[in-house]
From Swiss-Prot:
It is found in: Cell membrane. GO terms for biological process: cell wall organization; glucan catabolic process. Belongs to the glycosyl hydrolase 17 family. Glycans are attached at N369, N392, N420, N596. The keyword Heme does not apply. Its EC number is 3.2.1.39. This is Glucan endo-1,3-beta-glucosidase btgC. GO terms for molecular function: glucan endo-1,3-beta-D-glucosidase activity. The keyword Disulfide bond does not apply.
Amino acid sequence: MGDRSEQYGDIPPISSQHRMHGYGNNGEPAAMPGDGQQNWGSGPGIAHTHSMRTASTATPGMDNLGPSAVGGGISGIALGVANTHDRQSGIDAFRDADATLGYIPAERGYHTTGADNPYVPSPPSVGPGPDESSEGLRSHETFGSSAALSAAGAPAGNWTPPSGSRHSFLDGSYQGVASGPYQRHSAYSSQDYPADINPDDILDDGDDGFAAAPSNKPNAAGGAATGGAAGGLLGEFFGAKKAADASYDPVPGAGLPSVEKYAKPRPSGASRKRGWIIGGILAFIVIGAIVGGAVGGTLGNRRSETASESSEVSADDDTETNGDLDKNSDEIKSLMAMEGLHKVFPGMDYTPWGVQHPECDKWPPSQNNVTRDMAVLSRLTNTVRLYGTDCNQTEMVLHAIDRLELTDMKLWLGVWIDTNTTTNERQLSQLYDILDKRSDHSVFKGAIIGNEALYRAGSTKEEARKNIIDYMRQVRKHFNDHNIDIKVATSDLGDNWDETLADATDVVMSNVHPFFGGVEVSKAAGWTWSFWNSHNAPLTQGTNKGNIIAEVGWPSGGGNDCGDGANCKDDTSGAVAGVKQMNQFMADWVCPALENGTDYFWFEAFDEPWKVKFNKGDEQWEDKWGLMDPGRNLKPGIEIPDCGGKTAA
């Protein structure tokens, strides 16, 4: 992943003499008339509430009135605003900038200029002056299935599958933070998790994110001690033989001597009878204690499992108990009837729980959990994106789509690519196997080969670019040879895209996160649109290539980011994580994007509590990007816009 602090200096400062069009002398956006309404999209006078910010400026880098403009061209903007602003197109838009197209400021600090923005941008002021470092506006860590959003995160593969909580597959309660990625009613047993995994020993896909497993067994040491002591007593009374100097380590400080040390001549007559009586009494007491402990432990477990089927329930147990869930299952019907969900997202990023290799070989993920997830996701979107192929995750998603009869659901396949060629070859082989076995590929929108591989490459970015391009060419050749007609793409930070990478992909897929730019939420939607249109849209103009925002979202809590982490002057500066802020970003972004046809994936549907391990100091947002908690419950206070009943295609 690399130390993110070394990655944040990729944003050149904006020279003071280059005041951007549409901004006042103080660098603030020129305010637009009107106090609460703005015409959006192609329809006449689509009114929005005051939450849709009215301070409007223009998007950079292209002519949004053109037919090839991302987001619908003339139909995707407010015409009244567009006709009052001078615009430059293409490369001309950057002629007076500090740098060429390849070096324009990154998404973390771009002051916009040029044409119009349906999201009413108001980009943040760049912290550093012309002669200062631009470290304050930074890139973010990869969001792929298990990567942390903070540099505090341990390397992939460093965590082991943890214990699950004691909640039912049927209840919606939040399970423990140490319960792994997407620990929504985990079917994994905590009893067998390894205590330690060396990431260097794992042929991994970079997706490991398991936290160490705390023991769920109450009084485990005490129970073992009782068993050891009881075993010793019963062995003595029933003549068991033991090796000399045997140690009963569960007993604190117990290096007990061997039974032979206490051996005595066999008693005769009354002494023997008395010994048997005493022995019987003691044996009865010991056996009673053992049975009582076992019953108590069972009842204690059952008490916790009355409200839950805890982590003791395996994936097979789940299927045996609940069957292979489908659209007619009561539990699925309940999930799909959840209030507050609206299908307004063009796409959703998703990683099933427990699809880390090689852990999944021992603790397979639950098909029913994936089916539950897909039931909820089907209420939010018709397109789901995966990040890898390990652990049958793709097959499970496809099975869930079939069981739920989601005829409109489409899937972007994911292939995890890193510096481990064994991982890469395994992932690609699984991709080919999935597609070669199917004659009907209509459910697939494409295959994404790698996520933020360039960002994670650090100083070897150019080599990583060549490798990603080579992998995409390999995949495309296999598809052509096997008559597989789906798109081949990769995804990376918006500021890592250039013409070379764009030429090799069928779709430019950029991850754009205003939160990590320290952008105030009231300006975040416009800033996102402006960045995307300046950095990524020009790369596909005049071509038939697609252009998608592969990740965009906002955390529901955990602090605030001022462009260089949590180093803010107070807790209200910069990008503030919170339910209120998430709601505002959705209000400003979701419906206008739906109206003008902006294609994007929301990050993400469900919280990932295992990422709490990556939180540090005042940066406590790693595990809080979901619209819902890990139990598939809409977070209290979260309001997904209904966009007047309009739904995503």
